[in-house]
Amino acid sequence: MSLNIFWFLPTHGDGKYLGTAEGARAVDHGYLAQIAQAADRLGYGGVLIPTGRSCEDSWLVAASLIPVTQNLKFLVALRPGIISPTVAARQAATLDRLSNARALFNLVTGGDPDELAGDGLHLSHAERYEASVEFTRIWRRVLEGETVDYDGKHIQVKGAKLLYPPIQQPRPPLYFGGSSDAAQDLAAEQVELYLTWGEPPAAVAEKIAQVREKAARQGREVRFGIRLHVIVRETNEEAWAAADRLISHLDQDTIDRAQASLARFDSVGQQRMAALHGGKTDNLEVSPNLWAGVGLVRGGAGTALVGDGPTVAARVREYAELGIDTFIFSGYPHLEESYRVAELLFPHLDVAPPARPESRGYVSPFGEMISSDILPKAAAAS
């Protein structure tokens, strides 16, 4: 099975270490463009753009990077309750048209009650999922060319329609992640691809089976994806040393404050991430080569695959055997790690090489010359 590998745009900040300003770097448009262009050239299929008040706006970031990339797709957040589904459908169609069919959409219900209240959304967890189902039903139908009347508990529209259709037909794909029963019900009914954060394979297998069964009851099939960090090096020892360095500036007070902040979230997925490490730095390898250190201070995806290329590839294939075909990776710092993952991991996976124009001698395709006039040896076949 050919895998879809995505990268990640760190619009909330980037650096060499977690929990400190040391080694941090400014995430401006130039830096985001560097990461997007690297991902485009290296053969990543797309990039996930995060959402929330700690991030730059995902739609504006995507729109600004369309002109500086060629093949890269942009996975952008849809926020039910914060925007009208009809307006969101128009925006989605425009982004798809302007990007020449490079727009993908990620339904995000939100998990931080404080942030949601600041955005004017005062719904409980259950009510947010009710509203998200209504939003998605309208959004899909409008994008597919229907004129929609809908009288829901949370959303009412009359004569909602779209005059400029998307390029992707019947509409761009919809991604979504959530661990609660309500989230799985929504995924089974509404989305093309269900995402999970990087839990141990047995836990992921259970979630996939649940969503697959619920989708089958509705006569649907759903694809599956996973969101993971990656720390890959030439040897396993180097990879684990890099993992240790990433959290080398963390102290228990910083971890405790981060976990206290995340504890207010009503996201089941966030609770499952926190349970993997319990706020402690011992026993962070929660499954072979699956390391929970990132989640000590980072919300959302909190686990990383750690090892050399063949080892990480074996773990990726373990998830793929469960039915996952899409992997959304990231690493710190995101520019350098996009190259490491492509160079050290891709050769061991079924990933299509990036399309490149035929070289005509304007740039050297072989690496740096040796002693001015000697070509370097060709790389050994993987």
UniProtKB/Swiss-Prot annotation:
Record-linked InterPro entries: Alkanesulphonate_mOase_FMN-dep (IPR019911), Luciferase-like_dom (IPR011251), Luciferase-like_sf (IPR036661), SsuD_RutA_monooxygenase (IPR050172)
Q: Name one GO molecular function term.
A: alkanesulfonate monooxygenase activity
EC identifiers of the protein: 1.14.14.5
A Gene Ontology biological process in which this protein takes part is:
alkanesulfonate catabolic process
> Which SUPFAM superfamilies would you find in this protein's record?
Bacterial luciferase-like
Q: Which Pfam families match?
A: Bac_luciferase (PF00296)
What domain of life is recorded for the organism? Bacteria
Which catalytic reaction applies to this protein?
an alkanesulfonate + FMNH2 + O2 = an aldehyde + FMN + sulfite + H2O + 2 H(+)
> Which leading EC class covers this enzyme?
oxidoreductase
Q: Which UniProt keywords apply?
A: Flavoprotein, FMN, Monooxygenase, Oxidoreductase
Q: Which PANTHER family match?
A: ALKANESULFONATE MONOOXYGENASE, ALKANESULFONATE MONOOXYGENASE-RELATED
What is the role of this chain? Answer: Catalyzes the desulfonation of aliphatic sulfonates.
Q: Which family does it belong to?
A: Belongs to the SsuD family.
Q: What protein is this chain from? A: Alkanesulfonate monooxygenase
Which source organism does the UniProt entry give? Ectopseudomonas mendocina (strain ymp) (Pseudomonas mendocina)
